[in-house]
Curated annotation (Swiss-Prot):
SUPFAM superfamilies, alphabetized: TPR-like (SSF48452)
Keyword terms of this UniProt record: Protein transport, Transport
Stated name of the protein: Soluble NSF attachment protein homolog FPV011
Lineage: Viruses, Varidnaviria, Bamfordvirae, Nucleocytoviricota, Pokkesviricetes
Gene Ontology biological process terms in this record: protein transport; SNARE complex disassembly
Any one GO MF annotation of this record: soluble NSF attachment protein activity
Keyword Plastid: no
CDD domains: SNAP
Family: Belongs to the SNAP family.
């Protein structure tokens, strides 16, 4: 009688065989998570990735693989549950901080900030996490990335009509980039935004800032950004709305006026030319 040989799969070996190592079990759970993600079962994927990370932490509380699993869980939950995604990223931050992976900590804070800004619409919490990201980037010597985070805070501050804080940030970043050869001429944008922020509440302060920037950075006076703000300031001083509108149209012809700048121009227009508009 011919003997029949049964081929036992690794799954059943693990199921009925001796206990498996926790890393192997976590790997199996992670594999399941990837399968869930491949068919867009985001909640199942997120829970499985998180479980995998949790299992790895039981073996090693400073497991970088666990932190990576928490980030994967966050990416899955981001599709369906912003708050759960934040919880997963916060868990990853704890591990990365213990490991001294501060650049990655900064990236996690950036991701949390973006969720608060774009999905949950809680600007104060977004600002808090951008500040954290800026601090960690700066501590690791990534000064441009640190400044980029601060610029995001400045733009959110404009949305909150905190023009003083926004102006100070734009000014500081402008100074920082002014002293760096590769980004020296980028500073003209930050200086323009700083003056616009100040102009939203105080024409005299805006004028003083313009004079100061031209003294510190003589090349600034030759840039179109400087010429634009000079025309805007002149229009505000004389309360000439035609000059104000003409300056904006001229600048817009060769430049993109983004949402933040447009918001400030509308604020300035309303505050300065309210009678003329009516």
């Amino acid at each position: 009688m011919q003997k029949i040989k049964l081929k036992v799969s690794p799954f059943f070996k693990n199921l009925f065989g001796p206990p498996i190592e926790i890393e192997e079990a976590a790997g199996m759970v992670s594999h399941a998570a990837n399968l869930f993600a491949s068919v867009q079962l985001w909640e199942c994927a997120g829970k499985a990735f998180f479980k995998s990370g949790d299992m790895l932490l039981q073996k090693n509380k400073n497991s970088i693989a666990a932190a990576s699993s928490f980030v994967d869980a966050a990416n899955a939950f981001k599709k369906i549950d912003s708050y759960e995604a934040i919880n997963c990223l916060s868990k990853a931050i704890e591990v990365y901080t213990c490991l001294g992976k501060f650049y990655t900590v900064a990236r996690c804070h950036m991701n949390i900030a973006a969720i608060y800004e774009n999905d949950i619409l809680e600007l104060d919490k977004a600002i808090f996490h951008y500040e954290n990201a800026s601090g960690y980037y700066g501590g690791e010597g990534y000064n441009k990335l640190s400044d980029d985070c601060m610029l995001l805070i400045a733009r959110l501050s404009i949305q909150k009509e905190d023009f003083d804080r926004a102006g100070k940030i734009f000014e500081q970043v402008g100074y920082n980039r002014m002293n760096t050869m590769l980004s020296k001429y980028e500073s003209r944008h930050q200086l323009l935004y700083a003056i616009m922020c100040y102009l939203c509440s105080d024409v005299s302060r805006a004028k003083r800032s313009l004079d100061k920037y031209k003294d510190i950075f003589p090349a600034f006076k030759d840039f179109k950004e400087c010429k634009f703000i000079e025309k805007i300031l002149a229009a505000c001083e004389t309360k000439n709305i035609e000059t104000f509108t003409s300056a904006i149209e001229e600048y817009d012809h060769g430049n993109t006026i983004d949402e933040a700048l447009m918001s400030m121009l509308l604020t300035i227009r309303k505050a300065t030319f309210e009678d003329e508009v009516e």
